[in-house]
Curated annotation (Swiss-Prot):
Family statement drawn from the similarity comment of this UniProt entry: Belongs to the adenosylhomocysteinase family.
SMART domains, alphabetized: AdoHcyase, AdoHcyase_NAD
EC number in record: 3.13.2.1
Annotated Gene3D superfamilies: Adenosylhomocysteinase-like, NAD(P)-binding Rossmann-like Domain
GO BP: L-homocysteine biosynthetic process; one-carbon metabolic process; S-adenosylmethionine cycle
Location(s), subcellular: Cytoplasm
Essential cofactor(s): NAD(+)
GO molecular function: adenosylhomocysteinase activity
Described purpose of this protein according to its UniProt entry: May play a key role in the regulation of the intracellular concentration of adenosylhomocysteine.
Pathway named in the protein's UniProt entry: Amino-acid biosynthesis; L-homocysteine biosynthesis; L-homocysteine from S-adenosyl-L-homocysteine: step 1/1
Keyword annotations of the record: Cytoplasm, Hydrolase, NAD, One-carbon metabolism
Name of the protein in its database record: Adenosylhomocysteinase
InterPro entries: Adenosylhomocyst_ase-like_sf, Adenosylhomocysteinase-like, Ado_hCys_hydrolase_NAD-bd, NAD(P)-bd_dom_sf, S-Ado-L-homoCys_hydrolase_CS
């Protein structure tokens, strides 16, 4: 399918097929009903329009649920430009509906890396060549691009150093091109940039690393570590969407299979329970003794990945780290083993080394590839090692994404409202807002809260209306 680059009023966009807009609009309407928290925030602030005229760039999976987030930001007054944060995660009917509504969106399923970073550049380029005042990021690619461009203008030689991957080379080539056209583009952009809210674990790691190195340029809100994000999206979202992605891609019977979950953080916990719930015999690999003990106490076998080779049928990486499954591991896997990733980036599996190896690649269907080694054994790689739940299915359900996106919207409101007082650093949303996000979702699922009496509140030393837990409390 060719992409469509067109104009609607003054909003340039690039999507796969604009004729899918009506289908997308129908699904957006259904999704709104399943996203009570986000819709409540929209109703609360739509008249006030606290983001009036604010230029927002989003880099986040262009799904039906994200469309509801985008239109919430627009209803709050923002001028929004959007790209997806993954080459396979766009739902083309969602992108078409948003483009038809007049929002500049640059996203389609199956982008090349060159196209992906071109889309990201378009998303940060607002009318008149201006940059974003706020950023909604997922994985930190917009934040990375702006910071690397800024450092290049300050004399950094990073763009001329050897690249560790094809994607890194693509980024460097793009930055060189931009620098040749406008040697001060990123400095002009940063002058008006007021903050970023980051969606996922991997992007948060990038933010903290930049902060430690003294390179972070703006205040950043770590949305990922809001309890109503990490303990819901990462855990319950993955519990439903991982199995969905594997089943849609392969139609394999999960029951009775040996599944190896690499990592037992919140995403790993959700993934392990996802496959155990379908009858798989689940093994967990971990580096952290606390997480390893948790997995063992849940009844999972915990061992090294090397000990699973030859008996694992399904491998899932969810660590946020690199080179978890190596080429050597894949050569030793059981014939027809399924290998996939539900961490943000594709470097958890050594995809570059696999593609450069002597293994022969055969595409079974989009996002499902069989690699056959010279000895005759084969493995299946799903979504080219990228997010399997979004590459091979439609990601998390709307209800759980309402939690995450309510947090994103509140973070954007907070960054703009307090733009003159925030200092450069990484922050989390206050506990009271975290509890409010949860509260907005209770009625939808029939929950009735118990109310503290004044005496009980005094006994606990908390307000009757909350917040009820200290910041260090582990849910």
């Amino acid at each position: 399918m060719g992409t469509a680059t067109e104009k609607l009023s003054d909003a340039t966009f690039k999507v796969a097929d604009l004729s899918l807009a009506e289908w997308g609009r129908k699904e957006i309407s259904v999704s709104e009903f399943e996203m009570p928290g986000l819709m409540a925030i929209r109703r609360k602030y739509a008249k006030e329009k606290p983001l009036a005229g604010v230029r927002i760039t989003g880099s986040l999976h262009m799904t039906i649920q994200t469309a509801v987030l985008i239109e919430t930001l627009v209803d709050l007054g923002a001028s929004v430009r959007w790209a997806s944060c993954n080459i396979f995660s766009t739902q083309d009917h969602a992108a078409a509906a948003i483009a038809k509504a007049g929002v500049p969106v640059f996203a389609w399923k199956g982008e090349s890396l060159e196209e992906y970073w071109w889309c990201t550049l378009q998303a940060v380029t607002h009318p008149g060549g201006k940059g974003p005042q706020l950023v909604v990021d997922d994985g930190g690619d917009v934040t990375l691009l702006i910071h690397k461009g800024y450092e290049l203008e300050n004399g950094s030689d990073w763009v001329n150093t050897p690249s560790g991957s094809h994607e890194e080379k693509v980024i460097k080539d793009l930055l060189k091109q931009v620098h040749a056209e406008d040697p001060q583009r990123w400095h002009k952009m940063v002058a008006e940039w007021r903050g970023v809210s980051e969606e996922t674990t991997t992007g948060v790691h990038r933010l903290y690393k930049m902060q430690e190195q003294g390179k972070l340029l703006v205040p950043a809100i770590n949305v990922n570590d809001s309890v109503t994000k990490s303990k819901f999206d990462n855990l319950y979202g993955c519990r439903e969407s991982l199995a969905d992605g594997i089943k849609r891609a392969t139609d394999v019977m999960v029951a009775g299979k040996v599944a190896v979950i690499c990592g037992y953080g919140d995403v790993g916990k959700g993934s392990a329970h996802s496959l155990r719930g379908m009858g798989a015999r689940v093994i967990v690999t971990e580096i952290d003794p606390i997480n390893a003990l948790q997995a063992a106490m849940e009844g999972f076998e915990v061992t090294t990945i090397e000990d699973t080779l030859g008996r694992g049928d399904i491998y899932v990486t969810c660590t946020g780290n690199c080179e978890i499954i190596t080429l050597e591991h894949m050569r030793l896997m059981k014939d027809q083993a399924i290998v996939c990733n539900i961490g943000h980036f594709d470097n958890e599996i050594q995809m570059d080394r696999l593609n450069e190896s002597d293994a022969k690649r055969l595409q079974i269907k989009p996002q499902v590839d069989m690699y056959t080694f010279p000895g005759g054994s084969s493995i299946f790689i799903l979504a080219e090692g990228r997010l399997v739940n979004l590459g091979c299915a439609t990601g998390h359900p709307s209800f759980v994404m309402s939690n995450s996106f309510a947090n994103q919207t509140l973070a954007q409101l907070d960054l703009w409202k307090n733009k003159d007082t925030y200092k450069v650093g990484v922050y989390t949303l206050p506990k009271k807002l975290d509890e409010e996000v949860a509260r907005l979702h209770l009625e939808k699922i029939g929950v009735k809260l118990t109310t503290l009496t004044p005496a009980q509140a005094e006994y606990l030393g908390v307000p009757v209306e909350g917040p009820y837990k200290p910041d260090h409390y582990r849910y």
